[in-house]
């Protein structure tokens, strides 16, 4: 008797819907990559922005450096209520309160003020919760976006560095 060779013929695997979607997504990603390659290599269009000469436009919702606002009379809006310090998830805000004396009464609308107000940008995650928590609208994240430095002390913002001269947005409005 002779031996019989048995050959198994495998049926073709049918792709499920998620496998089809996966291949579609891969194809779409490759198409986007090809478009960018054609723009950069063949058409010689610039991909990057030359930073110091050209600055990009930021969205109106962009969260930049922290700024502190003054009211219309030029007084500090911050009344040292500690709301921003308590709500900060990164614990990046430090406030030291002091009583307002008669000599500086014209600078502060309430009976206490922030003697020391510091934000550690090395810890800050720019979540904007301090801006939302402030009942007086004293702190906003609408400053410049460039904050590179070679000195760690420059990344600790003091009240004097954050304070703007006069005005600022009305509570709840962005510039």
Curated annotation (Swiss-Prot):
Cofactor: [4Fe-4S] cluster
Translocase is among the record's keywords: yes
EC number: 7.1.1.-
Alphabetized InterPro entries for the sequence: 4Fe4S_Fe-S-bd, 4Fe4S_Fe_S_CS, NADH_quinone_OxRdtase_chainI
Catalytic activity, as annotated: a quinone + NADH + 5 H(+)(in) = a quinol + NAD(+) + 4 H(+)(out)
Keywords: 4Fe-4S, Cell inner membrane, Cell membrane, Iron, Iron-sulfur, Membrane, Metal-binding, NAD, Quinone, Repeat, Translocase, Ubiquinone
PANTHER family for this protein: NADH DEHYDROGENASE [UBIQUINONE] IRON-SULFUR PROTEIN 8, MITOCHONDRIAL, NADH DEHYDROGENASE UBIQUINONE IRON-SULFUR PROTEIN 8, MITOCHONDRIAL
Protein name: NADH-quinone oxidoreductase subunit I
Species: Leptospira interrogans serogroup Icterohaemorrhagiae serovar Lai (strain 56601)
Record lineage: Bacteria, Pseudomonadati, Spirochaetota, Spirochaetia, Leptospirales
């Amino acid at each position: 008797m002779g031996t019989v060779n048995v050959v198994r013929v495998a049926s073709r695997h049918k792709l499920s819907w998620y496998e089809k979607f996966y291949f579609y997504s891969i194809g779409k990603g490759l198409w986007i990559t090809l478009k960018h390659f054609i723009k950069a290599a063949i058409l010689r269009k610039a991909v990057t922005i030359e930073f110091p000469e050209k600055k990009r436009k930021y969205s109106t919702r962009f969260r930049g450096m922290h700024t502190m606002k003054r009211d219309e009379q030029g007084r500090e809006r911050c009344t040292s209520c500690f709301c921003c310090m308590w709500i900060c998830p990164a614990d990046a805000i430090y406030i030291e309160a002091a009583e307002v004396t008669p000599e500086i009464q014209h600078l502060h609308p309430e009976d206490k003020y922030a003697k020391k107000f510091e934000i550690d940008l090395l810890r800050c995650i720019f979540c904007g919760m301090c801006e939302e928590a402030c009942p007086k609208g004293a702190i906003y994240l609408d400053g410049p976006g460039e904050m590179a430095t070679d000195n760690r002390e420059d990344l600790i913002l003091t009240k004097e560095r954050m304070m703007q001269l006069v005005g600022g947005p009305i509570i709840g409005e962005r510039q």
